[in-house]
Structures are given as structure tokens and as C-alpha cells.
From Swiss-Prot:
Described purpose of this protein according to its UniProt entry: Catalyzes the transfer of the diacylglyceryl group from phosphatidylglycerol to the sulfhydryl group of the N-terminal cysteine of a prolipoprotein, the first step in the formation of mature lipoproteins.
Signal peptide extent: none
Binding site for a 1,2-diacyl-sn-glycero-3-phospho-(1'-sn-glycerol): 146
Start-end of Basic and acidic residues biased regions: 293-312
Membrane topology: Multi-pass membrane protein
UniProt-recorded name of the protein: Phosphatidylglycerol--prolipoprotein diacylglyceryl transferase
Gene Ontology biological-process entries: lipoprotein biosynthetic process
GO CC annotations on file: plasma membrane
Organism (species): Paenarthrobacter aurescens (strain TC1)
Keywords attached to this entry: Cell membrane, Membrane, Plasmid, Transferase, Transmembrane, Transmembrane helix
Gene this protein is translated from: lgt
Pathway(s): Protein modification; lipoprotein biosynthesis (diacylglyceryl transfer)
UniProt-annotated location(s): Cell membrane
Transmembrane parts of this sequence: 23-43, 59-79, 98-118, 124-146, 192-212, 219-239, 253-273
Length: 318
């Protein structure tokens, strides 16, 4: 039974998660994901330039990583929550309605990384260089994406009377509107722990910590991305234990709790191995490989240069 909620402060949730403009339905969940992609791409390009690359190269890789990541995130969600789409009375086509919500971060990261590998290979950039540059941006994107769950009134914890308790409405996913009571007011399911907010704030803090540690200690190539996985999974493990919405379980624990624990251990081991290696960035080097960025990919070979004769004419000297 839900505890009695005393009067006081609470975090309100929207009663509308979508708007219709003519025949087009705009989901706020999708807008949050899009905003996260834009912010993450901006920070990634900025950090990638500091590692010897260019904005154009960063965007080329991002254009591969993003669609792969979205597909991977959806696949992970559908596989781990297949009962939502398959079985008696279920609609399998719902698995394709990504705008209604449902992306698994681990599928997004894994398949997105595969897309980034393709883009990095095509642009002559080492994957570790791009991954290290992208790590804080991924956390910013995840922090923004969690607000899509706020619009959908989902991903909350146990009932609570804390001052920052989250109001949750009974939402109709088909219409993007809260279900109304007999007197015409939005139906409230209760007040719960705002786990979406906890995770969003954790991602912001982890992003700031990553940037600080990368600058302070010049972490080795690939270790920044490994540390991103360590930090995120540490928080996600705790937040999964707090959540009260339905999820498939293994031995009494949510699937994502197990995944977070296993990835934390694996990423921690990788970080300890890679942290002392040479850094994946150096804007001061003029060697053929600028710490992971192959200058020959742009047609420039630092072993070749131009000289000017006494008449001002330039001659290419191999």
C-alpha cells in the first residue's frame, strides 16, 4: 500500500508528453534525445579538436555512431523487455515505435561504438582517440535524455514523502496525455523517488569529473572511455536497485542491475590497464600520427613540405 502523502513540496510531472501539429505528432521524449545528441556532439567535436582532429572528422564519425546507437538502443530494449511487444494480445509493430520511448543504453553504446569504428576507419582516425573525446559528451547526452522519461512519467522509484518526491500521472502512451478522472483532472498515481533525476544529475557530475581527470592526469589512450563506463555503471547499479517499475529479473535482481555490475568490473580492469599508456591526444605533435589522428588521411604528409625560391615561387620538396 502506498504511504500517506503529507502536504508539502513535490516535483510535478507533465500531463502532456506529445503535441500534434497537423498530421505530425511531436514527442517530447524524442526532443530530449535529439537535444542530448546535439549537446553531446558539440562537446565531442570540441574535445576531438584538442586531440589533433577536426570538427569535420568528428562529425563524420558521429554521423555513423548516432544511427547505429539508436538502432542498438532499441534492440537492447526490445530484447530485454520482449514481453511488451510479443505474446498474446501484444502488438509486435510496437517494437518499431521508438518515439513512444524505450532505448537501452548498453545497446546504444555497443552498437554506436561499432558505427564509430566504421566512421573512424573511413576518416583515418584511431577509435580510442574518438572514444576518449566522446566520453563526457555521452554522459551529457544521457543526462538530457533522462528528461524524456520525466515527460513520459516513467522510470521512478519507490513511494516516498521526501520533499523532492516526484508526482506521477497515469499516462496514455497512444495520445501522450494524462488519463482524466471523473471530474476532469489528471489522474495521479502517487509520489515516488525521482530516479530519472538522480541519474541525470549523476551523469552531469560524472561528465565534469571525467573532463577534470583527463586534464589533470593525462589519462592513457582508451582509459577515458573505460572510466566513463566505470562511473556510469556505478551510479546505474544503485539507481536500478531503487526503481519500482516492472522489469525482467535474474535471481531477484533486474537485468540492468546485473549488466551494470558486470560492465563495471570489466571496465575497471580495462581502465587500470590503459591509464598509464600514452594519452590519446597531443596538439603539439607534428609526427605522421598525432596521437591517434593520422594526418595522411587528409592528404598531408609531414615528411613533405614546400620551399620558396628567391623569386617567390613555391616548389614542392618530397
Amino acid at each position: 500500500m502506498q504511504p500517506l502523502v503529507l502536504p508539502g513540496f513535490f516535483i510535478p510531472s507533465p500531463t502532456v508528453s506529445a503535441v500534434e501539429i497537423g498530421p505530425l505528432t511531436i514527442r517530447f521524449y524524442a526532443l530530449c534525445i535529439l537535444a542530448g545528441i546535439v549537446i553531446g556532439a558539440w562537446l565531442t567535436a570540441r574535445r576531438f579538436r584538442a586531440r589533433g582532429g577536426t570538427t569535420a572528422q568528428a562529425m563524420d564519425i558521429i554521423m555513423w555512431a548516432v544511427p547505429f546507437g539508436i538502432v542498438g538502443g532499441r534492440l537492447y530494449h526490445v530484447i530485454t523487455d520482449n514481453q511488451l511487444y510479443f505474446g498474446p494480445g501484444k502488438d509486435p509493430w510496437g517494437a518499431f515505435r521508438i518515439w513512444e520511448g524505450g532505448l537501452g543504453i548498453w545497446g546504444a553504446v555497443a552498437v554506436g561504438l561499432a558505427g564509430a569504428a566504421i566512421g573512424a576507419r573511413r576518416t583515418g582516425v584511431r577509435l580510442a582517440t574518438f572514444a576518449d573525446a566522446a566520453a563526457p559528451g555521452l554522459l551529457l547526452a544521457q543526462a538530457m535524455g533522462r528528461w524524456g522519461n520525466w515527460f513520459n512519467n516513467e522510470l521512478y522509484g519507490e513511494p516516498t514523502n521526501l520533499p523532492w518526491k516526484l508526482q506521477i500521472h497515469n499516462m496514455n502512451p497512444a495520445t501522450g496525455q494524462a488519463v482524466l478522472t471523473a471530474d476532469g483532472t489528471p489522474e495521479t498515481l502517487g509520489y515516488f523517488q525521482p530516479t530519472f533525476l538522480y541519474e541525470s544529475l549523476w551523469c552531469l557530475a560524472a561528465a565534469a569529473l571525467l573532463v577534470f581527470l583527463d586534464r589533470r592526469y593525462k589519462l592513457g589512450a582508451g582509459s577515458v572511455f573505460a572510466l566513463y563506463v566505470v562511473l556510469y555503471t556505478a551510479g546505474r547499479f544503485i539507481f536500478e536497485l531503487m526503481r519500482s517499475d516492472y522489469a525482467n529479473t535474474i535471481l531477484g535482481l533486474r537485468v540492468n542491475t546485473w549488466v551494470s555490475a558486470l560492465l563495471f568490473l570489466a571496465a575497471l580492469a580495462v581502465f587500470l590497464i590503459l591509464r598509464s599508456r600514452p594519452r590519446s591526444a597531443s596538439t603539439a605533435q607534428s609526427a605522421c600520427s598525432i596521437d591517434g589522428f593520422d594526418t595522411r588521411a587528409n592528404g598531408h604528409d609531414p615528411e613533405k613540405h614546400d620551399e620558396t625560391d628567391g623569386k617567390g615561387n613555391r616548389h614542392h620538396v618530397p
